[in-house]
């Protein structure tokens, strides 16, 4: 929507991106609306996108091109064909007509006081097919007044070495304008090809945050920007905002950033194996090529059965300050961690459950209540369920029932009802994510499941885990751990 686009434009502007292409007025209603607004930018130049005029038409007779030129945006991107085969087989016109289309369309825009970026579609494939004609299309754009010639790997199959060689030739051929690069990621090399073009002299880079785009996506700016800034090719980018802005865009576009994404993924600076985590604890940069904070991310030390002593101490010290002196306790915790991971538990993302487990092993229970039992019923075809739970706080036992949309929702409501009289602060706590994974699917209906629950109090987020052959039991255990953690005395200290 236009509102979503405004939010993305504002986020990219905060990051310091130099140009923000917001869409095609005349084709996209949201872009049409934006073209009439004052955009929320202080550093970025808004760019409207469109195509050259249709064959057989003069530019001022093409409704879409005229609408593009009439919008108040001072900079336009015009895309035109640079592949002779595409001109004949897709545009269904002759090569000279395509050159006329390019030159006159660009000239029409520049005569109307627009700065034109010319995107040469299918340029690298076109250059390999007919290099002389591909270069002629660029020359036509320059005659029309284009300030930037963007070489497009539209099919996403070009190799970095070829991109570098061809880009260098074009930079030498057209010294009077800037040369740009626009790569798709169909062969997984869009970032590498973009860097190759920059090394060859390209000074205008096109891409998308998180690589969002058709098919396999475009060159990923969340990966490219740190590389370009560190190499000294780009200035004005506030890299400390990279991860927050990437996550803002992901939220707006309703996509999930893969944990393994460089720089901005949740796992980009996560350390699990014993030697790696131990090295990070002793020397912060020993297993990281950049400081996580420099790109707005954070370091995470993940718990697993490979965890070494130093990692266990680092994770447990906020709750058990003398843990470093308790060698026997550390051994028991490490042994329990291995046994429970073998049973299907995972504490990499569920550190809150690990704290609860460690307290019980050390005979220093951090829990404030004891879950006694639960039941869940569903007596109709409707999704609504009824759950009953019982807890004990000191010498007092309390039971409560609640209805919910599904068993987990009902269980959560019943547990909260039980605890509110004892712990009013629980009212601020809410479940925000619930995931289930079958651990051993070959066991079919007897397979164990792992439930991972994410909870927040509005300030902090924590995760807990439960494992059982009964999904309701696994959910109940994960919910119990979540509330145990929220009520622990050192909760705030743990989050710093």
What are these regions (language model features)?
Residues 374-385, 403-416, 420-458, 469:
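A conserved regulatory-domain signal marking ACT and ACT-like small-molecule sensing domains
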Residues 8, 232-401, 441-448:
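A mid-to-C-terminal "edge-of-domain" accessory segment
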Residues 460-495:
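Mixed-charge, glycine-accented linear interaction segment located at domain edges/termini
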Residues 153, 207-214, 226-236, 295-302, ...:
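Short beta-alpha connecting loops at secondary-structure transitions
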């Amino acid at each position: 929507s236009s509102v979503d686009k405004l939010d993305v434009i504002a986020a990219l502007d905060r990051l310091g991106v130099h140009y923000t292409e917001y869409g095609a007025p005349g084709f996209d209603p949201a872009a049409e609306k934006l073209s009439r607004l004052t955009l929320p930018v202080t550093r970025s130049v808004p760019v409207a996108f469109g195509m050259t005029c249709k064959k057989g038409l003069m530019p001022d007779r093409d409704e879409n091109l005229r609408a593009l030129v009439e919008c108040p945006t001072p900079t336009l991107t015009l895309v035109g064909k640079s592949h002779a085969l595409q001109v004949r087989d897709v545009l269904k016109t002759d090569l000279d007509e395509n050159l006329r289309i390019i030159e006159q369309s660009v000239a029409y825009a520049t005569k109307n006081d627009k700065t034109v970026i010319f995107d040469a579609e299918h340029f690298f494939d076109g250059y390999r097919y007919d290099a002389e004609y591909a270069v002629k299309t660029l020359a036509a754009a320059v005659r029309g007044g284009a300030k930037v010639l963007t070489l497009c790997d539209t099919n996403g199959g070009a190799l970095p070495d070829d991109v570098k060689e061809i880009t260098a030739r074009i930079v030498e051929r057209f010294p009077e304008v800037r040369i740009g690069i626009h790569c798709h990621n169909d062969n997984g090399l869009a970032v590498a090809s973009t860097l190759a073009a920059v090394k060859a002299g390209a000074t205008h880079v096109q891409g998308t945050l998180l690589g969002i785009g058709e098919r396999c996506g475009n060159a990923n700016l969340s990966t490219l920007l740190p590389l370009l800034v560190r190499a000294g090719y780009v200035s004005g980018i506030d890299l400390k905002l990279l991860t927050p802005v990437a996550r803002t865009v992901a939220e707006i576009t309703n996509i999930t950033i893969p944990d393994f994404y460089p720089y901005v993924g949740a796992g980009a600076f996560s350390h699990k194996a014993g030697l790696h985590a131990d090295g990070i604890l002793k020397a912060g940069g020993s297993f990281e090529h950049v400081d996580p904070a420099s790109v707005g991310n954070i370091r995470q030390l993940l718990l697993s059965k490979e965890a070494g002593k130093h990692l266990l101490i680092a994770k447990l010290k906020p709750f058990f300050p003398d843990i470093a002196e308790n060698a026997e306790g550390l051994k028991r915790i490490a042994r329990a961690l291995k046994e429970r991971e073998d049973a299907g538990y995972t504490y990499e993302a569920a550190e809150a459950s690990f704290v609860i487990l460690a307290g019980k092993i050390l005979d220093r229970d951090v829990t404030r209540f004891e879950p006694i039992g639960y039941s869940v019923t569903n007596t109709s075809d409707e999704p609504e369920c009824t759950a009953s739970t019982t807890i004990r706080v000191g010498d007092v036992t309390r039971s409560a029932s609640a209805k919910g949309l599904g068993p987990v929702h009902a269980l959560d409501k019943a547990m909260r009802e039980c605890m509110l009289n004892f712990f009013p602060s629980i009212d601020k706590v809410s479940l925000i994510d619930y995931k289930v994974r079958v651990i051993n699917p070959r066991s079919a209906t007897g397979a164990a499941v792992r439930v991972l629950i994410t909870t927040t109090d509005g300030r902090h987020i924590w995760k807990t885990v439960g494992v059982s052959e009964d999904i309701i039991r696994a959910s109940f255990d994960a919910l119990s751990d979540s509330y145990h953690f929220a009520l622990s005395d050192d909760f705030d200290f743990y989050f710093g």
